[in-house]
Structures are given as C-alpha cells and as structure tokens.
Amino acid sequence: MSAQPEQTVKLTVDGREVEVPKGTGLIESAAFAGVEIPVFCYEPRLGPPVGACRMCLVEVEGIPKLQAGCTLTAQDGMVVKTAQTSPKAAQGQNATLEFILVNHPLDCPVCDKGGECPLQDLTFRWGPGASRMTFPKRTLEKPIPLSPTISLDRERCILCYRCTRFSENVAEDGQLVARNRGALSLITTFEDEPYSGAFTGNVTELCPVGALLPTQYRFEARPWEIQNVPTVCGLCPVGCNISVTTREGKAKRVLSRNHPEVDGGWLCDKGRFAFGHVAAEDRIREPLERVRRRGFAPLSWEAALDRAEALIRAAGGRIVTALSGSETVEQAYALGKLLRVGAGAHSAVLPEATSSALDAFAAPLSTIGHAELVVVLGDEAVTDRAPIVDLWIRQGRRNGAEVTEAADGNSLPEELTERLRGSDRAVLVWSGRGGGGGARLAELAYSLGFEGKPGCAAFHLPATPNARGVADGWAAAAEGEEQDPEPVALLVVSGDEAAADPAVRAMAERAEHVLAITMYHGLAVGWADLVLPGTSYLERDGSYVNLEGRVQRLRRATIPPAPDELAWISRLAERFGVAVSPHAAVVFAELSERLYDGLAYAEVGERAPLPARPAYQAPPPAAVQPSPPPPAPPGEHFLADLRLQRYRPLFSGPAVERTPELQFQRPPAEIELAAEDADRRQIATGDTVSVRSNGTAIELRARVSRALAAGTARIAEEHAGDLHRDVEVVKA
C-alpha cells in the first residue's frame, strides 16, 4: 500500500508565496519564506504557544486587528504582512518593546546576558531609539537565589513564561510558578523552596534576557572574551551535545548544542554544572609513587614511566586492567595495545556495556518521543542512569504514548506482549543492573518482531558514559583469550568509578601491586604503588559511543595539568615495541578499520549520524545469562535476609562531589526499605538503622517505600561502603 501524499497549504508572507505542510505554524512558515518574525516567548519544545510577549505581531489580510503570529497556523490562501512590510505591524512591535523596557533596568554593561541578549538585538532592530518615560523605574530585591545553581533578577524579567512552562510541561515538576497577576507578577517557587531537580538549569538557557543566570557564570566573562568549544558530555551514556564556554583556557559554563535526535536541546544539571571538577583542589597534577612511611612522593614523568615499565615487566602477564567506562575509545584501544600486545595481559574488568546485538534495533532517542507504547524494564530510575531519556519518555507520554514499567522481560503480561508484537511504534528501555542486560533486551526485541520496524527500538542504559566504546576499543586492540591470573601481580585501575566496583576493591586488596590512573586523591590512590594523572572528558580529544551506538567526537575544551593518557601510553608502549600514536585522530583511523567500517574522524563531525541497522545476530548464550551474584566473603556471620541493591544516583560520583553548587542535590545517607520489611522490623521513615554485612556495619537513615519489592533494600553506592549483597537491617 503506497503512502498517502503529504497535505500542504500555500500562503503568502511579505509578498513571497510559500508551500508548507498542513498544520505548520506561522513562525515556521515565514522562516520557509526567508522571513523572520521576532519572538521572545515562543519555543516549540515547551508545548502549545501562549502568545505572552506579543513580539510576533503580524497583519493578516481579512482580520482587522494585529495577531500574535506564534499562535497562528498556516492556512491555505492566508496573506500575512510582518513588520518588514506592514507599518501597522512595525508600530505594534515598537510599542511592545517600549512597554517591555518601561521597567527594564537597562543594565546591559553589567548584565551577563549583554552581547548575546535577544532583547538587546530585537530592541536595536525593531524598538524605539529613546524612551518617553520620565518616572522612576520599579526596583526589586536582587539577585534572588532560586537555588545554589541559579540566580533570579526579577527586574530584568519580561514575563515570557518560558521558565514556568519548562517546569510545568517538560520537566513536569511544577516547581516554578508566576505569583500574583498583571504588572505585579513574579517568577518564584512554591513556598520559596529551592528550585531542585534533574533539569533545572535549562531555564537559564531558555531565558531570553538576563533574569535567570547560572551562578557559576555571573560576572565571569563577556561574549567577546570567550570561546565555545563543541564537544560531548561525558557524565552519562546519552552523550548530550554541548558547547563548553572557556575564557583564558578555563571552563566557565556549559550550554546545549541541541542534537534533535539525541538530547532535544536539553541538559541535566549534572552535565551542565559539574564542569568545575577539573579545577578540584585534590586534583593530581603529577605522577606519584608510594614511599614507605612517607605516603606519596612526586616523580618526574621519565621516572614514572620507568617505574610503570618495571611493574608491567615484573608482573609477567599476571595483570588485570579495570576500566571505568569513562575513557575514550582511543584510550581503551591504546591501553589495550600496551598491555595486551606489549605485555600479554588480556584480563580486564570492563564496565557493563550495551550488547552489539542491539544494533539491529538501534534508533535515535527521539523515537521514544513519538512512540505509542513504551515499556521500561529494570530496577533503577531512568533519571539516575540516563536523565535525558526520562525527558524523552515524558514527551512520549504527552504525545499519547502509554508508558508501562516491568521488572524484566520475562515477566511481561501476555496482553502487553501481544500489543508490543503488533505495534509499529513500540520502545523498550532497560534501566538496571544485571549481567547480560543488553543481550537479553536484544533477544526480547527480536522475539517481539522489532526487526525491520523503523519505529520500534530497544535501548539499554549502561551505568557509565562510554561502556560500549571502552569494551569495543579494548577488544579491538588484540586477539587473545581472557585470562584469570592468580595471584594478580599488577592491577591497573583507570578512574575512581572503576575503583568503586566491589570486585575491583576485593582484587586490589590481594594484588601484589596497583597502578592507578586517576584525576583525584580518591579511593584508587589508597591502594596504589604508582599513580599517573588522569584527565576529564573536557580535556580530551577522542570519541565516545553513546547508548544508541552513535560514535561522537570529544574535543579538548580545557588544557589538562599533565599530559593526557594517549601521550604517556604512547611513550610507554614504545618501550615494549608497540606503536601507539599520541594523537586521537591517528588512533581512531587505526581502530576504525576494525570497529566502524573505516569511518573517518572528520565524518563524525559536530553532529554525528546514527549507523544503519544491521541484521540481527543472536548474542552468545553466555552473554544472555544474568551474572551470578558474587559469593559472600568469609567472615563474621549475620542473619542477612535482605538483598542489597546498590545504585548510582544522578547527583553522585567524583564530578558532583567536587562541585559545591550541586551539594544540595546529592543523595542523603539513607537506606530504602520495602514497606513489608520495615513493618516486620518496626522501622519508620526517619529512624536510624544499623546495616550489617559480614563484619561491616554502618548507620543510615531509613526511608520506607511501597514501590520496592519485599526482601530487597537500596543504598546509593557512595553510602554503601564495603557492604556485600546480603545485609541485615536493625533499628539502632
């Protein structure tokens, strides 16, 4: 059956005839004709237009009064005149700007929006050259701290309602509201509580004036002093496209670059505000060697490479490499060549990665926003693993999709399974731990007939930003069987995220030597014999593979305090007779032949495409089986009748820990208990409880949840310490 031709309408804008799809708004229709209609409040991503600012006034033939262009839909035969051809519309826009500026403070020289302000630009083009008002301007208390991350200047606010509409329609938190009415309207939060949530910072980018500003950027730079470096966020697997604003080589703010298929122009607060971690006080800026009784002593780079070479050679291949999933593909590949080819060490602890079998069901994340049925699997909140995916799910629900949650693919009701099988716009999202999650999801999608349906997709949300790329890069570095060296002569730990893995921590305790590659004086340093400085995603050139399977470019925005990983890996590999380039582009060209069908570095560009879907290839049976939980270690015995679930909240991890403005968002030190288990123990929310596990005991605040399954308990990973999988919880 052939597709129905798209219905179109013809209209005339400023004497130019244009044909557009039926239902297109007038603002977009005018843009098709090459005519700009100025706007303040209009933003299609925020939902239906509200016509609040009246900046878009146009004259429509047959209608006596000026109309708000943003509220109009193109009609066949419509004749529109904008301010460029209609004196009436020009006068209306001039008057609109004059009224907006009546109480505006005109403090452009000290306003952080000055030089990149739509109000400045439109006033220059369409507004009055001078004010007729002689009375004093209204003054208000300022700045108002909406939260530790956002400052509000109410004198500058033009009441476009972009911020309140974002809060109500996109984030759906309803925290930002307009209090009072008319000229007395003020933007605020209910009960003046701090504006908190995963996505609050987006209002600072939506604001068309300097009313809402990130506190980190106030009085930091002017637009003519900065550079905006296009790169990709490296704090979760979505891979949001960002611009890092730098001044004199230092990061000052992060803005969205709006990839409509990946992030839709939104950022989470972690990605927007946590850039300050690169300047943390405990940053490691030079190699360190453990010296008996004296802690650590700094080393020259030459001496550090000598020491690293000696450790690797002495290990004789009995080396395990623990990768965090934050490395670039090039770093993982280069480290793999050094250790696998140069030292014959093939054993690695890799982050939980998305299965390549899911490539057969790959699709842009924006597919979720147009789905009719979304099923979320797993036991972790989508916001914690991939926050922007949560916004896509919310958008899908607003567009009419049914959103259902289930524990796993094995427990789907038969009726839901049949609906998934019969749908052409169904999406599966797996958010949770468990070995084989991606492979099991691929099998489920295949069994539901998703293959060959462009509107159907399956997304696995890894816990780390580049899990897929790191696993692929390590595997492509060399051929060789995975080993299980015992005892471990050398443990190479890359990043504090890897060090937080209980399996890695247990291995570090019994390894003869530990080489840590890390940015901070954190967990990994406590075990290390040799520490080599690591870098942030803001300081790297290279590539990441996001959860869609999209290869994206990282560009260095700030200069690291020490040589980056590729630089010293290249020098160290040379000592083992292995050729590794210190340049990411050269390394990418080499690995691309093995991984990406020869994709050129330049082809990745600033807005990377999504590869075409291959035919489905079933994952090996071992990949589909859930990983068995590690056995409880020997030690003091407790009646441990609850299974502990560790999870990583969005506002956790090394970057957030080192961002003062985000401390109010960090997870409380608490344990979440199922209501049934709490009742048995006579525990209520707010009680202090002791959590015990094989000789380890910690005290936490209890929170009772009716959404948690009986027999399980949840603790944020940063508060779980050395607790094992089976715990006992008693009232303290």
Residue ranges and their predicted role:
Residues 2-25, 31, 43, 59-63, ...:
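N-terminal export/assembly segments and adjacent metallocofactor-ligating motifs
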Residues 37-39, 46, 51, 68:
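Charged, low-complexity terminal tails
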Residues 42-45, 336, 370, 374-376, ...:
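A cross-kingdom feature strongest in bacterial/archaeal respiratory oxidoreductases
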Residues 56:
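Acidic, glycine-enriched active-site microenvironments
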Residues 212-218, 245, 251-253, 321, ...:
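Acidic/polar loop patches that form or flank catalytic/metal-binding clefts of enzymes
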Residues 305, 407-484:
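Active-site phosphate/pyrophosphate-binding segments
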Residues 344-355, 400-409, 447-467, 513-521, ...:
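A generic structural motif
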Residues 358-359, 411-414, 522-528:
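Glycine-rich, charge-decorated loop segments at or immediately adjacent to ligand/cofactor-binding or catalytic sites
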